From Swiss-Prot:
Keywords: 4Fe-4S, Iron, Iron-sulfur, Metal-binding, Oxidoreductase, S-adenosyl-L-methionine. S-adenosyl-L-methionine binds at Y44, C45, P46, G87. It catalyses: glycyl-[protein] + reduced [flavodoxin] + S-adenosyl-L-methionine = glycin-2-yl radical-[protein] + semiquinone [flavodoxin] + 5'-deoxyadenosine + L-methionine + H(+). Its cofactor is [4Fe-4S] cluster. Binds 1 [4Fe-4S] cluster. The cluster is coordinated with 3 cysteines and an exchangeable S-adenosyl-L-methionine. [4Fe-4S] cluster binds at C38, C42, C45. GO terms for molecular function: 4 iron, 4 sulfur cluster binding; metal ion binding; oxidoreductase activity. Coiled coil: none annotated. This is Putative glycyl-radical enzyme activating enzyme MJ0021. It comes from Methanocaldococcus jannaschii (strain ATCC 43067 / DSM 2661 / JAL-1 / JCM 10045 / NBRC 100440) (Methanococcus jannaschii). Residues 23-246 form the Radical SAM core domain. Its EC number is 1.97.1.-. Belongs to the organic radical-activating enzymes family.
Amino acid sequence: MNVEEIEKYLEENFDKLPEGCKQCVKGGKLVLFITGICNNNCYYCPLSEKRKNKDVIYANERLITTVEEAIEEAKLCSSKGVGITGGNPLLKINRTVKFLKALKKEFDEFHAHLYTTPETVNEENLKLLKEADLDEIRLHPTKIFNEGYDEEYIKFLCNKLNLCNKYIEDVGVEIPAIPNMENEILKLAEAIDGIAKFMNINELEFSEENYHELEKRGFMPKDDVSNAIAGSEETALKVIKEFKGDLFINYCPSVLKDAIQMRNRLINRAKNVAKPYEVITEDGLLLRGIMIFDNEDDLKEMAEILEENEIEFEIIDKNICLNPFILEDIIEEMKRQRFPITFSAYISELYPTADALEVERIPLITKKLKFRRRR
């Protein structure tokens, strides 16, 4: 599915989506990675080395340690809700409840959904989650995709889903679209129909961590520009087409996460964190102009010129940061006047995230070129 097809699908099915998905698509969810600890060892797990099996907390891309930092990140992103993930959040139930309660207290009508596995679902944990006002829970039946379909495990899963229904308003199942597992996924859908409200099927993707495990099982990228796996989308769409029950099945392709959900979340954050001189792109990235000086006197003189002309700028690490388009105008004017200040310059494109990851540098020529003719 391309972006246009996804947008059409969302337009036609938006009202049917779980509330967590509705907000996620709009970029309105804080992604709270509560721990990397997990009892499962799924071969398709996409977590990076810095997160997998590490007891760390991230609010979106930001490494945090406190509730206050999570609240701050939610405000910076204008978040309307939170998706609590891991690892397995229920292995750190007290921490999960602490953060959930704090976010619910800080924000009005703040929707919360949580991902976990049926093995860690029990009455005690569910009571704590209900008290913390969890709105939605999604169970990932890992055993089916690691060991194969098993009727006893499906009964176990259904019992856990029924238990969740006693405490949590919206209960669903979240799975990967493993190529050629249509029959197993269809049987799973039939088993949970009438128990779960929805089943979310994610397109399977390569990551640095799972690449070798997926490759040795014969999986291949579907094209040269995507991390998605060939056959994964076809499996998901075939399941949706062939399922005849009442359960709502939603397919979440990788391009939706990158081109729509992530983009919307970046735009939300960029609007709150962009400095006066930075430009927000249509993809939610930030553009800034950078002037680099070897001579401190040149830096001071340029700063004085900018101040005299009431141009917004900032000095960071002996570099001047300013509006990229104004920088281009300044360079052209200085070339025309043969201004004696010496510097190099470029336009920086970066994420509006806590790590301010730079994705591109566009060098700018700051001096007139001199051409010589051969004689």
